[in-house]
């Protein structure tokens, strides 16, 4: 189940994270212990995750048990108690543990800081993690849940169930979910900015690699096709084991570089993440920046054709993966302003030409860059040194 209750919609900093960690605690009909025991007895797995736009509540189970888990998900959304003692004894400590774990994960920390710097911590720039410096009350969590947990804010997605079966479950189990209004967020405003922080491991030792993120405002989800192709064209990974890959970023020596595009409802971030020893990051960042500039000048039709094929594979994987309910792209298309099919999305990618990719790269470079530097910051570059 996807709920339109990501961090961009939260009424107070951290309440979206708190609701995520409240998932599968006591409801009006079931205690937290009963929920866990029944899931174990049925061989099921329950999980919750959070993005900037959505909260995901996922149940994985054996075929034949769908009625039980559909009832449970509906109860978690529609009849949650948000008990004070569970908040104080379980949720608050888990919030601190999540934040501490994220602080030790350079990728999680870097992406969160990048959005915060780019959007000044507002809307989509709101952190996915509650901060100890901004304490949350259980009353604030209840108030946000009352706004978010209603039928207008949820989408039910399944993998392995027929459409008719899913409709039947929705019409029987989810009638208990209260009616309400869909949450609305203020339009996103990109500012651009920088974040730099020394980063060590949990024991205070230097990490083997420093991390540098550079990004520009990208495109909204509805207009993301050219940038999705540009992301695939720049690449950074490999599709074949023991091969360095053919993309420009995969050719950078002594560093790992990867392009990314995080497309949201009304904005997006397109950028490159570099992981390398401190002394190698600056050169790798310059090479990556040159690759983006080269794409803005011109790209070959052959490269674009290859990138389109890669982008289409990634999109299909998002739509049809085994844990489809946990994919942002599916939830966004169901809960966004206009739903779209996989076929129409693939057609959009197929229509992208070389000129479209170059134009998209040119538009990026006209904007203000954002950057995040983690590690030995004295040796790490600034975005304005690269563009």
Regions found by a protein language model. Give the residues of each.
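An N-terminal structural lobe/cap that precedes and organizes the functional/catalytic core
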Residues: 1-10, 29-32
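His/Glu-based metal-binding/catalytic segments typifying zinc-dependent metallopeptidases
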Residues: 2-7, 146, 153, 179-251, ...
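Cytochrome P450
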Residues: 5-12, 103-107
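A short, flexible beta-alpha/helix-coil linker loop
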Residues: 6, 20-21, 55, 236
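Hydrophobic (often cysteine-bearing) scaffold residues that line and stabilize catalytic clefts
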Residues: 11-15, 69, 226
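Active-site SXXK
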Residues: 14-25
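Charge-rich, well-structured scaffold segments of protease-associated domains
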Residues: 28, 32-189, 212, 218, ...
